[in-house]
């Protein structure tokens, strides 16, 4: 059972209090949405998390897994500077239409400043999705791993392996490095990080 299955267990007032009490450590608000993570609560935990992000002035990161809710419903709610992780996930709930084109809601989200993060985990990254997105001029903003005990021995292994997967997909080495250093630092409003300058 995902942590957001029962919205009564979410504690938005406590989250705001804790975030404000330690601004050097708490850099954003994260919520997990999808059939596995939020189940019968659907998209409601995202509504609550957005309110917490607004109250704290922090960016929001949203995990997406299998539907419901749909990819479109999730990205439609995200604001400029918010981050969608597991963005190149496979069907169902891929950012691609059945014909392989990028969904209009995904294009609109990027145009308004939503950031797209790989969050490569065990089942949250698909080569076909990544190939289709990048071929259509939609590379990820952030390349990160979602490494844990179930994927450290594959398919993730480590961050360097995750980064290397984007070379054969057509991203340049400087683009890949920026997506793993400079861009995520800016996403968490710490532009002083992620650079040797």
Predicted regions and their residues:
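Divalent-metal coordination cores built from histidine and acidic residues
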Residues: 1-33
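Active-site core of metal-dependent hydrolases
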Residues: 31-132, 136-153
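Short secondary-structure boundary/capping segments
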Residues: 17-18, 75, 196-197
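Short gly/ser/thr-rich secondary-structure transition/capping motifs
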Residues: 9, 64-68, 186-188
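His/Asp/Glu-enriched, well-ordered alpha-helical/loop segment
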Residues: 128-197
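Electropositive phosphate-/nucleotide-binding environments in soluble metabolic enzymes
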Residues: 5-9, 13, 23, 39, ...
